[in-house]
Swiss-Prot record:
Name of the protein in its database record: Mitochondrial import receptor subunit TOM7 homolog
One term under GO cellular component: mitochondrial outer membrane translocase complex
GO term, biological process aspect, one: mitochondrion organization
Compartment(s): Mitochondrion outer membrane
Residue numbers on the Mitochondrial intermembrane membrane side: 36-58
Family: Belongs to the Tom7 family.
Organism: Caenorhabditis elegans
Record has Transmembrane as a keyword: yes
Membrane-related topology note: Single-pass membrane protein
Length: 58
């Protein structure tokens, strides 16, 4: 199956945009999921508050 140059260009640009979105969107997505779920309780039952500051400075 032969593809026209315009179709090849479109597919290439789509792959580039998808790659960019996945590379730059993965970490924020994981952080979002962490904030949405919340922290898991420690073995003694204490739940530590989850905030941006606790992510940066433990």
């Amino acid at each position: 199956m032969k593809l026209s140059p315009a179709t090849k260009s479109f597919i290439g640009k789509t792959v580039d945009i998808s790659t960019f979105a996945i590379q730059w969107g993965f970490v924020p997505f994981v952080v979002y999921l962490g904030f949405k779920k919340g922290a898991e309780p420690m073995p003694n039952g204490q739940i530590l508050p989850l905030s941006a500051m606790s992510l940066l400075w433990g």
